[in-house]
Every structure is written in C-alpha cells, then in structure tokens.
A protein has these predicted regions:
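Conserved N-terminal segment of class I S-adenosyl-L-methionine
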Residues: 1-82, 98-102, 107, 118, ...
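Short glycine-centered segments of the SAM/dcSAM-binding site in methyltransferase folds
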Residues: 110-113
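A short beta-strand submotif of the Rossmann-like class I SAM-dependent methyltransferase core
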Residues: 82-88
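Conserved loop-to-beta-strand segment in the C-terminal subdomain of adenylate-forming
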Residues: 122
Length: 142
C-alpha cells in the first residue's frame, strides 16, 4: 500500500507545485461564507505550501495544516468557525476519506467548504502514480 503522505512530502520537497493556487477561484465563495456566518477563525486543511495566504484578502488569518509540509504538519488543536479544504480530498486514499471528513467536521463550528477535483491530476507522484488517488464522480462526494 502506498504511503501517500511520504509521497507528498517528497513531492513538496522537490517541486514548487502545490503552492495553494487552487484557492483563488474559490475565494469569493469562502469570503461569502465567512461574512454570512460572522466567522473569525479559519482552518485551511491541506494548505500545501501555504503561498495562497501571502496576499490574504479575507478578514481572517487562517491556521494552516498539511501533513505533507513540515512547516504545517502539526495537527491543529481546538475548533474553528470555518474549515476550508480545496483540492485535497482527491489526494486522500478512499479508505481514509470517512475519517478525514469526520476530523474536518469536528474542527468546524459554523461551516465547511470543500472543493474536490473529479479528474486525474496533471501531477505525478515520485512513485509514478497519479496525484489524485481517489477519483470519483461528483455524485459520490455529495
């Protein structure tokens, strides 16, 4: 069985990708949720290298978590008004999805925002596997 976290750690170490750019198209939805729920705390679950927050336009500064990036690999404690996870779920092995969903829901007190890719990734892991290890149609995720 593939150790995906080890694969992603190696990929992050040797690659400038997974900078967090996939957040940009979603930012207006996230801002709307923050405003609607009057949220003041936010967790970016699977933040990659966290570069997406360099020019943060949101009214909150998020806590960053990504088990494959040494700088952000420590699991956060406590709860957050909102949890966002963009382009992450498809990188998690199918058998671990229920556990990750449960963990995310336990962190969130007001909202969860997920953006999940349903197509193969352009990226290939160091072991040659596609970076999207759980490819399912939208209906499967809902």
């Amino acid at each position: 069985m593939t150790d995906y976290i080890a694969q992603y750690k190696e990929y992050h170490k040797d690659n400038k990708k997974y900078r967090g750019d996939n957040l940009a198209p979603q930012i207006h939805h996230i801002l709307e949720l923050i405003q609607m729920t009057q949220s003041t705390t936010l967790l970016d679950y699977g933040c990659g290298k966290g570069n997406q927050w360099t020019n943060n336009i949101l009214p909150v500064t998020p806590t960053l978590y990504d088990p494959a990036v040494p700088q952000y690999e420590n699991k956060p404690t406590g709860t957050f008004d909102g949890v966002i996870s963009t382009d992450v779920m498809e990188h998690i092995p199918e058998e671990q999805i229920p556990q990750v969903f449960q963990e995310i829901s336990q962190y969130a007190t007001r909202f969860v925002f997920l953006a999940i890719a349903t197509d193969p990734a352009i990226a290939v892991l160091p072991n040659g596997e596609n970076a999207h290890c759980t490819l399912k149609p939208l209906e499967w995720w809902v």
